[in-house]
Every structure is written in C-alpha cells, then in structure tokens.
Amino acid sequence: MKPLVAIYGPTHTGKTDLAKDLYSRFPSELISVDSVQIYKGFDIGSNKPDKKELQKYPHHLIDILDPNETFSVGDFKKRSIKILQDADKKSKLPIFVGGTMMYFYSLLEGLADLPERDDLIRAELECDLETFGLDYLFRRLEDLDPEAALVIHQNDRQRILRAIEVCLITNEKFSTIQKHAVKEKILKRKILTFAIVPQDRHQYKKELHERFKLMIKRGLIDEVRGCLLYTSPSPRDQ
C-alpha cells in the first residue's frame, strides 16, 4: 500500500505545482481537496486548472457537480475512500492537494459518527430556505441549539441545514452529539504531509492583490453573476 500524500496550505502558495511535479515523477492519482473546484462554472474564482492542464494532470473531484447541488464533508470522505481503493489496486500514489482543511481533517483525523442525511427532512428544510430565507433557518437553529448557533456563522447555509437536520433526526442538540460522538478513523496507512505557507506575508498579500485584479479582468464578476443565476437563491437571501 502506497502512502498518502497530503499537500495543503493557503491559496497561491504553489500547492498545485508541487502536486504536478510529484505526478510527473511517480505513478499517481491527483485528488483535489477544494470545496469550490468541485463545482462546474466556478473556474476563475477558484483558480481551477484549465482544460489543457487537466488533460495533462487529471484530477479527481473537479467539475463533478452543478452549482445547485450540495456536497458535504461526508460526501468527500466517501468519494475519497473509493479513489484510495482504486489507487491501491493500481499501485498508484494518492496525492491529495488543496486548501479546504475540513476535507483534509475528515481524512487525516476522522469524522464524528453522526446520523446519515435524511432526504425527507432535508427537502423540508430546503423548502423552508426557499420560502423564508436563511435568516429564518438560523433563528430556528438558535431555538433548537443555542450553543451550535454560537459557532456556526449565520451565512453558512450548509452547516446550518446540517445542524438542524441532526437535531430533528435525533431529537437532541447537534452540539451535544458532536461532543460525545466517536471519531471514525478511516486511514490506516503512512501519511506524508506538506504544509506550504508563505515566507514573506507582505509580498504574499501583494501577490494576492495582483492576482485578484487579474481575475477581475478575466471575468470574475460575470462568473459570479452566472453562478448566482444558476443557483436561483431565495430573494430573501440576496
């Protein structure tokens, strides 16, 4: 069994370049660990590799969902396990690269054993979201679990929905369940981690500013507008 390579750090630090270099040197599978690059259409803002680059360096978990589809940490874990199993069968080195630390945490540290998603409850919550808006759901979370509401941002749609869903499934507070849940350790292999951080923070901020200006020139604003139209958010949340 090959070790797992984990390359993580903030944006624009050379993570992808290192992953591509390793891919060129060893029989490998590249796995994106990015909660935005999984979506089609979020190309400029996520600094997604272009089609030509992806042909040369194919990545798992890029462009796998439409913008209106949901993807949880649990979904990432399940897909990653399958990719790891396939990589092992081919004797390939799995290289996980990206900046979504919660995804990495689910792999390296394990996830709390929470109840599976309930499609009926989730559909009802999605309906409430569309009808009444996210503020309404956040107030509902405050009523169900004030402690969870203190640590979940009021604009974090995914976590608000999940916390309420768990409360309704279990008739217990989400925060209480998290405290007592046993984490499921899924990896029993050697892990090689590369944490890439900028050495000169002043220069780093300057480069980020320049990259953002370039993104604007490339059409970032139109990209965001297109994604907002595609996802059709509730008027209350605009």
Predicted feature descriptions by range:
Residues 1-232:
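Phosphate/pyrophosphate-binding catalytic cores of soluble transferases and nucleic-acid-acting enzymes
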Residues 233-238:
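A short, hydrophobic C-terminal helix/tail in secreted or cell-surface proteins
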